[in-house]
């Protein structure tokens, strides 16, 4: 799915359209769904749960029954947490923007790569191809770190919020542990600089544009 820095760039570009008042909390909410990987004994199915896709493989999300199941879980989360009177509403709004961006990523970009492999007579689930894809996600993220001008200083602003959790999904400890890992990996450690192999920076840039448009429409539809 989309890279961590790519998610943060999307969140950054949504600050003004969504009229975010607590940007640090919104950024942190945007990082939250993947923080489950900091859980002791982490297994892949746990991440499916935090992304509202219990039992759903990425390749199957487009199937009507899978998409309907995902949307029900999404609606359940928004009904529970996205209350305008909640002081943490923007934390959960950040969480939702991550999920919506991944939805766009899976149903458009990832599926396009799968179709391309199939058209070439190759295994649509080729492990080597998607290992290269994953490396390219990091390379594209690190180019964003070097080139994208965030509206607030990164990673400093991520440290302004510490006391938060996503009840029933991610604990405070997991969120803090994951955030520390993200900062170390993406902002403190020297990055490899080379051209992506299968997932280009231009392709990632187009995805960011598409995701921002989709998320704004989805949020407008939800609040109207």
Predicted regions and their residues:
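N-terminal leader/auxiliary helical segments
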Residues: 1-224
């Amino acid at each position: 799915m989309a890279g961590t820095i790519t998610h943060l760039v999307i969140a950054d570009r949504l600050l003004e359209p969504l009229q975010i008042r607590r940007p640090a909390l919104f950024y942190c909410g945007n990082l939250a769904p993947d923080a489950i990987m900091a859980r002791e004994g982490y297994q892949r199915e746990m991440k499916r749960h935090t992304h509202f896709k219990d039992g759903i493989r990425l390749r199957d999300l487009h199937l009507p029954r899978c998409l309907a199941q995902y949307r029900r879980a999404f609606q359940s989360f928004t009904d529970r947490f996205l209350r305008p009177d909640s002081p943490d509403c923007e934390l959960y709004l950040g969480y939702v923007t991550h999920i919506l961006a991944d939805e766009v990523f899976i149903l458009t970009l990832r599926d396009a790569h799968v179709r391309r492999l199939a058209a070439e007579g190759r295994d649509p689930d080729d492990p080597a191809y998607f290992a290269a894809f994953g490396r390219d996600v990091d390379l594209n993220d690190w180019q964003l770190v070097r080139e994208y001008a965030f509206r607030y200083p990164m990673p400093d602003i991520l440290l302004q919020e510490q006391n938060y959790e996503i009840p029933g999904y991610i604990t405070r400890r997991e969120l803090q542990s994951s955030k520390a890992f993200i900062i170390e990996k993406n902002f403190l450690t020297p990055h490899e600089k080379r051209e992506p192999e299968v997932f280009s920076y231009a392709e990632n840039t187009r995805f960011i544009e598409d995701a921002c448009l989709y998320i704004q429409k989805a949020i407008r539809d939800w609040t109207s």
